[in-house]
Amino acid sequence: MQHRMLGKKLIHAALVAATAGPAFAAADRYEIEPNHTYPSFEFSHMGISVWRGKFDRTSGRITIDRAAGTGTAEIVIDTTSIDFGLDKMDEAARSEDWFNVAKFPTATYKGTLTFVGDFPRTVEGQFTLLGITRPVKLTLNIFKCIPHPMFKKEVCGADAEGDLNWSEYGMKHSKYGEGDAGRVHLRIQVEALKQD
């Protein structure tokens, strides 16, 4: 009788492990490659030209569950690394009127990947800038994974874009660009290396 009960318990445990194991193993984790990831943006300058800038330091992680067709993204942007290609502009952008990096040295994005077929096509997320969080949707124009020739691991890359408005985040500079003039177009190149 005891042997029979023990046998049933072992079978039950094996079934639970077989069911839970693949679901847990299906989620792959990727670390952002900071040397290949640059959130960039562009916006109208008084309606007569377009200014473009980027952030040079970014970290974070991405998870992908291909079996379930889901994933997540968590990105941390070092706002002190703002780069317009012009020192005076960079200095102004770090000031209280713009990104106020002394008080808010980072901006964050946390989102959920939506798959169409075998690949993620959009990210529905929350972007926090200057302590204010607003929804931002990103469209993935490119998403591809390949074996990395140097690291011998899978690396995934994407090109994403979306839109936001300075004024929604309380940026003081936005007083010069309210309404449509405050619109900012995001272009984000990202690469992430699979973790063991």
Language-model-derived ranges and their functions:
Residues 20-22:
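N-terminal signal peptide c-region/cleavage motif recognized by signal peptidases
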Residues 2-12:
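Bacterial N-terminal signal peptides that target proteins for export
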Residues 24-196:
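Low-complexity, acidic/polar, glycine-enriched regions of mature
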